[in-house]
Structures are given as structure tokens and as C-alpha cells.
Regions:
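Conserved beta-strand positions
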Residues: 48, 85, 113, 152-155, ...
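Short, acidic/polar
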Residues: 61-75, 129-145, 189-195
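Alpha-helix N-cap and loop-to-helix initiation/capping positions
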Residues: 60-67, 93, 97, 125-136, ...
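Acidic (Asp/Glu)-rich catalytic clusters
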Residues: 40, 77, 99-110, 142-146, ...
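Beta/alpha (TIM)-barrel catalytic core signal, keyed to glycine-rich beta->alpha loops juxtaposed to Asp/Glu
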Residues: 26, 30, 158-312
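Active-site groove signature of glycoside hydrolases
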Residues: 142-160
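N-terminal binding-site loop/beta-alpha segment at the start of enzyme catalytic domains
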Residues: 2-109, 238
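N-terminal small/glycine-rich loop or linker at the start of catalytic domains
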Residues: 39-59, 112-125, 149, 154, ...
């Protein structure tokens, strides 16, 4: 079984237009988005995803190593204190970059990583939930990140070849051993979340969710009901909707912002448990992403965006 990631027709987080980069790039602090408590860890609701820091196909080193380091350091300067990564990004290289850029970590910085996807080449992702493999990857992430305990460890994918209870159960055992503080899940449905919660306390879920892909609505509603974090990956994939002459263009202009920034503002307004993690490999893309934390949509604007983009 292979997962090939987002479709090639969608816009990646690091592809804003020149016009987008010229709008609303003031150094807004990520704290403008408000905060959320994940377990007992309080973080700003605008995080950073490290997948785009690596090479093409999320494979190999970045094209510009020094710029990747600058991106991470600038993110923290701008108040981003929730950094999402995974053993499979690179593989391993994103975790290495995070340690190089940010270690020793500030007390308020939360590093969330994942395991459960095996990499054999660019754009190839193979679920592997063998409990012994998950344990091995947790141990290696501890070394790469330079920590004694991982703040949030997420099961990257549920492997159908192993019982869910065994996969989550191994993370629970590692938690009891003090190697993991909190456990999260990625790409699950409501039933899988509830099944996992019979084995361990789950504090977050991470699914594909954005203006144009809302198949995880039921999971988001469940996360909000339970008060656990919902981390949408690929949050800026809005395709043609992000074009200046698309449905978001006029409203974006009213805010002095870009359509992509409005897409982030919509997510932040959608639910108080949402923690977007837009990623990029360039500082000049990072800053407008963080600036979106300062955009406050009215309920009327939120509903207008919702109506214009639903089902697109």
C-alpha cells in the first residue's frame, strides 16, 4: 500500500505569487491567532510544518540549507511555538534541521513529530505500524531532536496490517516510560479516534483539511466536542480559489491581504481547536503566513468564504 501525497494540481504552501508576497507582510506575531492547550502545553494557534524544508518529493536535503535554518529561527522569532515534523520528512532531515536551528529549545517551544510511514524514495509513503518499528523510530527521533522526551508524538498513519490497538498501545507504553509526553493521530476517522482512545489518551488529530478539502468535517466536529487539537495539514491548498481574481480576491483586497492569507484566517475562524501549520522553505513566504494570524474575519465574511468555496 502506497500513499503518494497531495495531488499535483494543488498549490503547495510555498508557492505564493509575487502579489501575495507584497501584501500584509508586517511582522505580526503568531500569538495574534490566540492560543490552544494541547495536553497541558499551551501554544499559539498558528504553527509551522517542516515538510517543505526538505528536498523535492520530501526526499533528501533542502536546496538551500542555510535558508531552511533561517526559516525555523525566524518562525520562532515571530511567535511560532508549535513546530510539526516527522521522521519521514527527508527522511530524518527535517528533525536534524530543527535541532540545528533551535536547540537548545526555548521553554515555550513544542516540537511534535510522527512515525508510521516508511520512505523508499521521493513521494513514496508506505504505512508501517509494526510496534517494534514505531519504538525504533521514537528512539531515533529522541536522538535527532536532542530531547529526553517528545512533547507530542503522532501515529502518522494507521497500518491495516497491524491491530490499531497494538500501534497505539506501543506509543502508550513509550509514554509510560517517559519518552513521549502526549500522543496524537494522523489521517483517522471518528471511529478510529474513539478506538484509539480506548488504549491511550489522545490529545490531537492531524488530517488533510482546507477550504477545498473538507472530508474531515466529522472528525473536526468531534475534536471540537472533545476539546482536542485539530491540526490541518496542507492548509493553503486552495487551487484556483487562491488566485487574485478568484472567489477570495475581492475580500482579500479589502483586508490588504492575499487569498492564501484569507484561507488561513478562515481556518482559524472555523474552530477554536484548529492549529494550522503552513510550511515553507523561504523566509519571505513564512512572514505573510504568520501575518495571517492578525486577520480577523467577521461572521458575515466567514460565511461568505464558506459559501463561495464549499464543494469546489
Amino acid at each position: 500500500m502506497r500513499w503518494t501525497g497531495p495531488g499535483s494540481g494543488a498549490r503547495l504552501e510555498e508557492d505564493p505569487t509575487d502579489d501575495e508576497r507584497s501584501t500584509m507582510t508586517d511582522a505580526t506575531n503568531a500569538g495574534a491567532a490566540g492560543t490552544i492547550t494541547i495536553g497541558e502545553l499551551t501554544v499559539n494557534r498558528l504553527g509551522f510544518g517542516s515538510m517543505r524544508l526538505t528536498g523535492k518529493g520530501v526526499w533528501g536535503p533542502p536546496d538551500d540549507h542555510d535558508e531552511s535554518i533561517r526559516v525555523l529561527r525566524r518562525a520562532v522569532e515571530l511567535g511560532v511555538n508549535f513546530i510539526d515534523t516527522a521522521d519521514s520528512y527527508g527522511p530524518y532531515l527535517a528533525e536534524d534541521l530543527i535541532r540545528e536551528a533551535l536547540h537548545p529549545y526555548r521553554d515555550d517551544v513544542v516540537i511534535a513529530t510522527k512515525a508510521g510511514l516508511l520512505r523508499t524514495g521521493p513521494d513514496v509513503w508506505i504505512p508501517l505500524g509494526n510496534p517494534s518499528y514505531l519504538r525504533q523510530e521514537v528512539e531515533m527521533s529522541l536522538r535527532r531532536l536532542g530531547v529526553d522526551r517528545i512533547d507530542l508524538h503522532q501515529l502518522h498513519r494507521i497500518d491495516p496490517n497491524f491491530p490499531l490497538e497494538d500501534q497505539v498501545g506501543e506509543l502508550a507504553t513509550l509514554q509510560q516510560e517517559g519518552k513521549i509526553r502526549h500522543i496524537g493521530l494522523s489521517e483517522v476517522d471518528v471511529d478510529q479516534l474513539k478506538a484509539a482512545q480506548k488504549v491511550a489518551s489522545i490529545v490531537s488529530v492531524q488530517n488533510l483539511y482546507n477550504l477545498t478539502t473538507r472530508t474531515a468535517e466529522a472528525l473536526l466536529d468531534e475534536a471540537e466536542t472533545q476539546g482536542i487539537a485539530f491540526i490541518p495539514w496542507f492548509p493553503l491548498a486552495a487551487g484556483p480559489l487562491a488566485d487574485a481574481d478568484g472567489p477570495l480576491g475581492s475580500l482579500a483586497a479589502d483586508h490588504g491581504a492575499s487569498p492564501s492569507q484569507l484561507a488561513l484566517a478562515w481556518l482559524l475562524k472555523r474552530s477554536p481547536v484548529i492549529v494550522p501549520i503552513p510550511g515553507t522553505s523561504r523566509v519571505d513566504h513564512l512572514e505573510p503566513n504568520v501575518a495571517a494570524a492578525g486577520i480577523e474575519l467577521t461572521e458575515e465574511e466567514f460565511q461568505a468564504i464558506d459559501a463561495a468555496t464549499a464543494g469546489k
